[in-house]
Amino acid sequence: MTFSVDKVRADFPVLSREVNGLPLAYLDSAASAQKPSQVIDAEAEFYRHGYAAVHRGIHTLSAQATEKMENVRKRASLFINARSAEELVFVRGTTEGINLVANSWGNSNVRAGDNIIISQMEHHANIVPWQMLCARVGAELRVIPLNPDGTLQLETLPTLFDEKTRLLAITHVSNVLGTENPLAEMITLAHQHGTKVLVDGAQAVMHHPVDVQALDCDFYVFSGHKLYGPTGIGILYVKEALLQEMPPWEGGGSMIATVSLSEGTTWTKAPWRFEAGTPNTGGIIGLGAALEYVSALGLNNIAEYEQNLMHYALSQLESVPDLTLYGPQNRLGVIAFNLGKHHAYDVGSFLDNYGIAVRTGHHCAMPLMAYYNVPAMCRASLAMYNTHEEVDRLVTGLQRIHRLLG
């Protein structure tokens, strides 16, 4: 199938709107991606004609809704090549998935004197839960430092492991720098030390295929809303043997086998024991539509288009005076920058006046900002629906801001 950005853009209604009298150039998909009509329509159709509470319902609508939900679990397992659909837990997003692991597996397996390894480039969602766990149990948090070019100092990683290292929690792709970490060698090294590995895949799954069996990671988590799906839904993958050993984190309906006031409660099997309460079934249906949409386009086709667009963007941005770029030359999805001494918020506001949407701030990565000694950065992210013309508008906008502000 030949990739056509014009055909893709036609599927996204919001891309036809104007902002400040100019066509919208949406360069903020790393924060949250726009949704194609196929996703919007699938969720709306479910609410119009198929909604019911899932699980245990004997009536037709409930049975059909349950089947649709479980079919999405199967589709998601194929999307990341999990061995079984029962290795996937529906969560609200990447943040909840990481917190689930920290509060279930972490509480059961990390003790005083143990340690967990993260990196200096992590999103707060892959820092704070581990800080909280370490504070609860008296464990140590160790950090892989950054290089100035936005890659990790991987030569330090072997020195961080010891017999007390329980987990390596690492991002697949940096949400600020676009750095893709060499997971295969990092996971192999961790497993040689008997250490489990959690991968934050929030910024990876939309850009190229992910194969969790080939990676051999123990946990992999991602959000639907960055993958052109709805908000409030994501996937946590856990190797089946590991998942079956983990205790539930939240209690309530749907996650129990039996409840007795005198004899206590027993749990249902995984993954359902981690899905307490009424799920976001509409969001799950929308996620399924997003997975189907992206799979039909072909992730390899998407990857090729996006990489060509990224190379073009980086080359064109060289013409902007006083522009500082952060991150390696080879990157996925995002371009973080600052313009001269001007605050990122000011630059972002000017770009918005030109109809260009970028993200400004610390990007939930304050340790990374501290490393580069800046309070904030601008971030333009490139998705499968962005165009060379939008890149040109970004470059022209930055050149204009430089002329105006000096």
Swiss-Prot record:
An example of a Gene Ontology BP annotation on this entry?
Answer: cysteine metabolic process
Q: Which UniProt keywords apply?
A: Cytoplasm, Lyase, Pyridoxal phosphate, Transferase
Q: Which regions span the lipid bilayer? A: none
User: Which cofactors is this protein said to need?
Assistant: pyridoxal 5'-phosphate
Going by the entry's taxonomy, the superkingdom of the source organism is recorded as Bacteria
What GO annotations for molecular function exist for this entry?
Answer: cysteine desulfurase activity; pyridoxal phosphate binding; selenocysteine lyase activity
The GO cellular component terms are:
cytoplasm
UniProt xrefs under InterPro entries: Aminotrans_V_dom (IPR000192), Aminotrans_V_PyrdxlP_BS (IPR020578), Cys_dSase_SufS (IPR010970), PyrdxlP-dep_Trfase (IPR015424), PyrdxlP-dep_Trfase_major (IPR015421), PyrdxlP-dep_Trfase_small (IPR015422)
What residues sit in the active site?
364
Show the PROSITE patterns listed in the entry.
AA_TRANSFER_CLASS_5
Gene3D superfamilies xrefs: Aspartate Aminotransferase, domain 1, Type I PLP-dependent aspartate aminotransferase-like (Major domain)
Pathways involved: Cofactor biosynthesis; iron-sulfur cluster biosynthesis
Q: What is its main location?
A: cytoplasm
> EC no.?
2.8.1.7, 4.4.1.16
- Please list the residues that carry the modification N6-(pyridoxal phosphate)lysine: 226
Entry keyword annotation includes Ribonucleoprotein: no
Q: Which family does it belong to?
A: Belongs to the class-V pyridoxal-phosphate-dependent aminotransferase family. Csd subfamily.
Q: Which NCBIfam families match?
A: PRK09295.1 (NF006791), sufS (TIGR01979)
Q: What does this protein do?
A: Cysteine desulfurases mobilize the sulfur from L-cysteine to yield L-alanine, an essential step in sulfur metabolism for biosynthesis of a variety of sulfur-containing biomolecules. Component of the suf operon, which is activated and required under specific conditions such as oxidative stress and iron limitation. Acts as a potent selenocysteine lyase in vitro, that mobilizes selenium from L-selenocysteine. Selenocysteine lyase activity is however unsure in vivo.
Designated name of the protein: Cysteine desulfurase
Q: Which organism is it from?
A: Escherichia coli O17:K52:H18 (strain UMN026 / ExPEC)
